[in-house]
Amino acid sequence: MEIDLNADLGEGCGSDEALLDLVSSANIACGWHAGGANAMRDCVRWAVQKGVSIGAHPSFNDPENFGRKEMDLPANDIYAGVLYQLGALSAIAQAEGGRVAHVKPHGALYNQAARDSRIADAIVSAVHDFDPSVAVFALANSGLVTAARNVGLIAVEEVFADRGYRADGSLVPRKEPGALLDDEDKVLARTLSMIREQRVQAVDGQWVPLNAQTICLHGDGPHALAFARRIRGALQDAGIEVHAAGAARA
């Protein structure tokens, strides 16, 4: 049994280099919600050194809201924005001896793409036109998974052990009760059950089937790094191997 562990990096949390010792895939902010050229280069260099798959983490151009505010943009704007951010990270990766192997949208762009086919299609078109061997990390069972596969891209289905789920498989919005789970023991147990049982219990008690191919480890918060180490250790103890997913395995 195996799983991919991913983390969002280059967002100013200060633990990027240490997190790269624990994950197999890195989603690197491309400057539109956080980060910038130097942060991108640092994260890419560390990822190359540690053998971690490099991924772009594009967002809406919204640093004021950390990319978490929903936007109603034309599909052409979304396409161009994703391609622009991909190109920036790819140039840095090439200079450092690496390559962009996957794309994971950030924040509102991620959530809107999960349910809005117009946005999902714009994202996957940009990825496909950039490099059709690049994988797309998307919320498990979401419309972005479908859109990626419809154009022949590898879709890697992502789950979150520390986020609340609705019965339809979507995430509970951050401002609503039950959105974030802060009991580390419960999150740890949930991580293992998601991998083993391929399902998650929604906030209303229903069980939602899902295809857990990659799990996001959040790197922000005062105890995030220590907890990430606990999760990695628990996976090792359970005999679950950690490997990069998608194009990075090719």
UniProtKB/Swiss-Prot annotation:
Any Pfam family from its record, for instance, is LamB_YcsF
Keyword ATP-binding among UniProt keywords: yes
Instruction: Supply the EC number(s).
Output: 3.5.2.9
| Signal peptide residues on this chain, from the entry's feature table | none
Output the GO biological process annotations, alphabetical, semicolon-separated: carbohydrate metabolic process
Q: Which GO terms describe its molecular function?
A: 5-oxoprolinase (ATP-hydrolyzing) activity; ATP binding
> What does it do?
Catalyzes the cleavage of 5-oxoproline to form L-glutamate coupled to the hydrolysis of ATP to ADP and inorganic phosphate.
User: Assembly and partners?
Assistant: Forms a complex composed of PxpA, PxpB and PxpC.
Homology family: Belongs to the LamB/PxpA family.
Q: What is this protein called?
A: 5-oxoprolinase subunit A
